[in-house]
Regions:
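Conserved glycine-rich cofactor-binding loop
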Residues: 9, 16-17
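A short, exposed helix-loop element centered on a Lys and neighboring polar residues
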Residues: 121-122, 166
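Short C-terminal tail/terminal secondary-structure segment
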Residues: 4, 146, 226, 238, ...
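Substrate-binding pocket helix/loop in short-chain dehydrogenase/reductase
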Residues: 72, 90, 96-98, 102-110, ...
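Catalytic Tyr-X3-Lys loop
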Residues: 83, 99-118, 137, 154, ...
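Catalytic loop of short-chain dehydrogenase/reductase
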Residues: 137-160, 165-174, 185-188, 220
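Short, small/polar-rich loop/turn modules that mediate ligand/substrate recognition or access, typified
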Residues: 173, 178, 248-250
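Alpha-helical segment proximal to the catalytic Tyr-Lys
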Residues: 126, 170-171, 246
Length: 264
């Protein structure tokens, strides 16, 4: 499928691994001029090199923590006028015990998963509306719609992000700019592996990956019957970044193998 974005400038914030990397690969394959950010320099540089060689694409790595003002400024300087903005920001460490959550932990969660994406969008939206074309996609989490105690530090702030984008998306749609959210469920990523310890804490389990995974699959039925890979999300992310998605506005698209049962 031709996404009709060849030559466009695209940012993938958090593009060195996991769902961000998989999405970046799809964008590079589509022929965009790609900018990817991440905090870890070595993995970021390797990702940029591999994608550039594989797809013959221009891939610029930007070492930056998008949850900080300094990190965002580095991004803004490196790519001042993108056509496409995709964002995934690693959330705070999971915590399965609500009694252990402190005000400082809440502030960190909000700064990372709410203020960070909002400030990036707020910076780039005026240019997109002026140019009468733009695509913005937030890769968040299905716990924004489906609360889970062991995802307590991720879900609430992301729910606020969904509320924000629902309003803003309708303000900018008339200018040819679309804004949507993807809400992934359980994917095999580094973040999933790191969540097993708080998951064990929340349910009184041995902190062992096999034990926790067996418990999760038994108690959180995924109709599809498996945990997803990042490549299971990337095609939808790329579609939302494309010319083909011009009539998709303000949507929260759940990609979870059917785990979250809802008609909306």
């Amino acid at each position: 499928m031709d996404l009709q974005i060849k030559g466009r400038k695209a940012i993938m914030a958090g593009g060195s691994a996991g769902m961000g990397r998989a999405t970046a690969e799809r964008l590079a394959e589509a022929g965009v001029e790609l900018f990817i950010t991440a905090r870890g320099e070595d993995r970021l540089m390797n990702a940029a090199k591999e994608m550039s060689e594989k797809y013959g694409a221009s891939v610029t790595p930007i070492v930056a923590d998008s949850s900080t003002e300094a990190g965002r400024e580095a991004l803004f300087e490196a790519c001042p006028d993108p056509d496409i903005l995709a964002i995934t920001i690693k959330p705070p460490a999971p915590n399965g015990n609500f009694l252990k959550v402190t005000p400082d932990m809440w502030r960190s969660s909000i700064e990372t998963t709410l203020i960070g994406p909002i400030e990036i969008m707020r910076h780039y939206i005026p240019g997109m509306t002026e140019r009468k074309w733009g695509r913005i996609v937030n890769i968040a989490t299905f716990s924004a719609k489906n609360p889970m105690i062991w995802r307590l530090m991720s879900g609430p702030a992301r729910s606020a992000l969904l509320n924000y984008t629902a309003s803003v998306s309708r303000e900018i749609a008339e200018h040819g700019v679309t804004l949507n959210n993807l809400l992934p469920g359980m994917f095999r990523t580094d973040g999933f592996n790191e969540s097993m310890e708080p998951y064990a804490d929340a349910f009184g389990l041995e902190p062992n990956m096999d034990v926790c995974l067996a418990h999760f699959m038994e108690n959180n039925k995924i109709p599809a019957g498996f945990l997803a890979d990042p490549d299971d999300l990337a095609p939808m992310a790329a579609l939302l970044c494309s010319e083909l998605s011009r009539f998709i506005v303000g949507q929260n698209i759940v990609i979870d193998g059917g785990q979250h049962a809802s008609i909306f």
